[in-house]
Amino acid sequence: MQDADTQTTIFGNTVAELVGENLRIGIVQARFNAALTDRLAQACLVELELLGVSAKHIEHVSVPGALEIPIALQAMARRKDFDALIALGCIIRGETYHFELVSNESGAGVTRVSLDHATPIANAILTVENEDQAWARVDDKGRDAARVAVEMVNLMEELS
């Protein structure tokens, strides 16, 4: 049993200490809703640094929108240069069916890349009803994405 000083809490659950040292992380950020995704990325990058991930081990690229995230993740995963990947985007409901299409397809694409390449991907593509909901979530979800990526790498190492 670990003592409380070596544990952290994610999503209300206590987990082993997250160790990001020497990890290589790839980040794909959608530029659509750029003010929001920039803030999401900023929170994610700060948290990765706090977890011990070196800035020189982070590759951060941008794509036009959420639907382009999976193919960029796939290109990164194929290179096998990364321990984990992070998807950052923000989809805000509009008046048409497009919200469901973009939300469902981008989410499914992220999952498929993760499974096809056995690479942990933290999915922080926000799907919200309005801009206020997005602003209320960007900092927490950016930090969570960093933590999820590091936790999943640590777990995958334990399981292999």
From Swiss-Prot:
- Give residues annotated as binding 5-amino-6-(D-ribitylamino)uracil: F32, A66, L67, E68, C90, I91, I92, N123
Catalytic residues in the record: H98
Q: Which reaction does it catalyse?
A: (2S)-2-hydroxy-3-oxobutyl phosphate + 5-amino-6-(D-ribitylamino)uracil = 6,7-dimethyl-8-(1-D-ribityl)lumazine + phosphate + 2 H2O + H(+)
**Pathway, according to UniProt?**
Cofactor biosynthesis; riboflavin biosynthesis; riboflavin from 2-hydroxy-3-oxobutyl phosphate and 5-amino-6-(D-ribitylamino)uracil: step 1/2
Q: Can you tell me which residues bind (2S)-2-hydroxy-3-oxobutyl phosphate? A: E95, T96, R137
Any Gene Ontology biological process:
riboflavin biosynthetic process
Similarity comment = Belongs to the DMRL synthase family.
Name this protein carries in UniProt: 6,7-dimethyl-8-ribityllumazine synthase
Query: What's the encoding gene here?
Result: ribH
